């Protein structure tokens, strides 16, 4: 019987905020453990929330082999890789930062009210097995979400100040958000024209859609927008999209649910606009004769699968540096909050934009009224593509 052990520990210290004041401080420290056993092409799994002895879970997992769940695939093996990206963050440090930030916001922006949280997260993921696999990922970071409300409006909320960082720099956070809130006070109209440049802080919506379309099983069965198009030029030659497991970029483990570690923590799925890989786990690769790309998902107590959400594991590679130069003097929109939209199966996209700003490539100038935008994946990443820039 081959054995595999997964342990996840998550510690969170949260300063809860209401009406621009710290109202409570809460600490959570949760351990989750899972054990997988493999015998005669079958898998048995046991899991628990809590720090239970491995031997207890091991016995339960062996019993669960009787369920007959097939898993005739080789285990990841002969690799030790331990990485740590951040040390412990004291609870008092979280409270001190929250109080300091709120003092400035109350003083300089009394026309806004702020709520939600300032938190510190410490995480540890480990996976080891009887075949010589020994992986461990440790990290710690500040996570801030301050929902803002203009006191003069009847809205439940009007936007948010957000930040995620291993090393929180208070003055940098305040400097950016002073400009953000000053622009929020300055109400401006939409520039003229049906077609305008739009920038976002991330690319969650298109990457979630692309992640679903790159599912190897869906691709092989003909149910993907990309089915049969491997090797074709689908997007701008400037675009490279990677399956990226670099914790410095993603803040998540560098291995998938089957313990697969990618070379240099990344693998291109689109390279210079060409579709060069789809997403597969061990089962999908073997079943459909596709390259194995290390994209298994699943919880600590689940059978690894390809059927998870892959958008968060994908990333555009930076291909441009100067936003102002790219705009060539044209006014642009910085879409800060756009929820309620989606892609259709053919790649068409539409969404309302709740919070957006007029942007000149260097400065946020003023807050725009709510509007709706629409496009198509082929245009967004083809003729209308401007670039992917580092967040600075």
Give residue ranges: language-model regions.
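Active-site bordering "gate/hinge" segments
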Residues: 1-255, 263, 271-274, 363
